[in-house]
């Protein structure tokens, strides 16, 4: 008893090896092998072996020695395994998570044989397409093929109206032999296409504008540089022209002065003497009256104009200035030298103090010229 108890404890606690199982238990009958071969030939499904208790007699409660003779008698293996197993018993139970979601792929097939029930459903491509077409919501909707006339009419309508109201949509669908949904979907897709095209154009235009702005800025900078350079050149040219013009004027004036000095120097010594002599004669002999003074002033002015030549008017020399100053001073002395009663008769009002100062200065100037 102790040996058997230890053997049972060791068998339960530790898994026995394959050799130990084969030596300790009697061999399996050939009927099981033959029945299993027959069932495997009948069906292509996975083989379901009998329970583990039936294969091992030691685990079978009827064959254990402790149960004695009161246990169930061992059934005959030939009678139990000779008859084929029904198809319903071999089919596994169907659980909710094993059910397919789409009703389109469910095929109701009659359970004629175990192979047709358990094996994979082999359908042709045409049958699968028919099943997919038959199911409305499960399959993907086919793409609509529009004709050229339909596309032309839709494009014309989109050109005038980007959005359609429902009456117009129904009208177009009736005219083009389309459904209202097809017209609506086409307009939605066409609006998205139009949006993409406009965005691309805007991006290209913005890039072009940016490039044009950069080019215009560069052109403006170049023009500014050119304008500054041209202004500098023009200023320098103007300065050079001015310098050349002034140099030419100076040269011409020097030439004219030299020519006038050489040509007119012979006549000048005579003319001042004649004018001075005339002035002195008038100053000595004539009485200091206003009419005489005016006559002498007219004569002196005429003599002065006669003495001045056109060459002397254009380029006056130092001698001309001296002659003019002496003549004018003499003429003024002749005009101012009369007494106070004669000068008071003149229309110009002059005070006595200013008149005395003016006569004193003129007499001093006349004396200086007379000394020469």
Curated annotation (Swiss-Prot):
Q: Which InterPro entries match?
A: HD, HD_metazoa, Homeobox_Antennapedia_CS, Homeobox_CS, Homeodomain-like_sf
A Pfam family cross-referenced in the UniProt record is: Homeodomain
What coarse category fits the chief subcellular location reported for this protein?
nucleus
Q: Where is this motif: Antp-type hexapeptide?
A: 94-99
Question: What GO terms describe the biological role, i.e. biological process, of this protein?
Answer: regulation of transcription by RNA polymerase II
Q: List the disulfide bonds.
A: none
> What are the start and end residues of every segment in region (Disordered)?
42-93, 194-225
Question: What keyword terms does UniProt attach to this protein?
Answer: Developmental protein, DNA-binding, Homeobox, Nucleus, Transcription, Transcription regulation
One Gene Ontology MF term: DNA-binding transcription factor activity, RNA polymerase II-specific
**Cell location:** Nucleus
Q: Cross-referenced CDD domains, in alphabetical order?
A: homeodomain
- Protein's UniProt keywords contain Nucleus: yes
PROSITE patterns, sorted: ANTENNAPEDIA, HOMEOBOX_1, HOMEOBOX_2
GO cellular component labels: nucleus
**Which residues carry the record's DNA-binding region feature?**
139-198
Its family? Belongs to the Antp homeobox family. Proboscipedia subfamily.
**Function per UniProt:** Sequence-specific transcription factor which is part of a developmental regulatory system that provides cells with specific positional identities on the anterior-posterior axis.
Q: Protein name, please?
A: Homeobox protein Hox-A2
What organism does the UniProt record list as the source? Bos taurus
């Amino acid at each position: 008893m102790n040996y058997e108890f230890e053997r049972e404890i060791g068998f339960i606690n530790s898994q026995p090896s394959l050799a130990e199982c084969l030596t300790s238990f009697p061999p399996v009958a050939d009927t099981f092998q033959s029945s299993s071969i027959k069932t495997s030939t009948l069906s292509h499904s996975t083989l379901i072996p009998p329970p583990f208790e039936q294969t091992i007699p030691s685990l079978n409660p009827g064959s254990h020695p402790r149960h004695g003779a009161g246990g169930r008698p061992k059934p005959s293996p030939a009678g139990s395994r000779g008859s084929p197993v029904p198809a319903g018993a071999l089919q596994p139970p169907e659980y909710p998570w094993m059910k397919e979601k789409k009703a389109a792929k469910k095929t109701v097939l009659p359970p004629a044989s175990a192979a047709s029930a358990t094996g994979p459903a082999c359908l042709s491509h045409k049958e699968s397409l028919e099943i997919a077409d038959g199911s409305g919501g499960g399959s993907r909707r086919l793409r609509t093929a529009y004709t050229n006339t339909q596309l032309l009419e839709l494009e014309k309508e989109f050109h005038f109206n980007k959005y359609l109201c429902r009456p117009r949509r129904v009208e177009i669908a009736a005219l083009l032999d389309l459904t209202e949904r097809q017209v609506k979907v086409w307009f939605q897709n066409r609006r998205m296409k139009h949006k993409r095209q406009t965005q691309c154009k805007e991006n290209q235009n913005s890039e072009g504008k940016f490039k044009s702005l950069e080019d215009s800025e560069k052109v403006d900078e170049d023009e500014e540089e050119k304008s500054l350079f041209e202004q500098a050149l023009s200023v320098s040219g103007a300065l050079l022209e001015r310098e050349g013009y002034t140099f030419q004027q100076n040269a011409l004036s020097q030439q004219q002065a030299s020519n006038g000095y050489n040509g007119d120097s012979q006549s000048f010594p005579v003319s001042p003497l004649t004018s001075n002599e005339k002035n002195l004669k008038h100053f000595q002999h004539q009485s200091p009256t206003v009419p005489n003074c005016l006559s002498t002033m007219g004569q002196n002015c005429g003599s002065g104009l006669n003495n001045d030549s056109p060459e002397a008017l254009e380029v006056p020399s130092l001698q001309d200035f001296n002659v003019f100053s002496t003549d004018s001073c003499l003429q003024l002395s002749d005009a101012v030298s009369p007494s106070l009663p004669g000068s008071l008769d003149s229309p110009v009002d002059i005070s006595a103090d200013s008149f005395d100062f003016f006569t004193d200065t003129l007499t001093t100037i006349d004396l200086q010229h007379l000394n020469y």
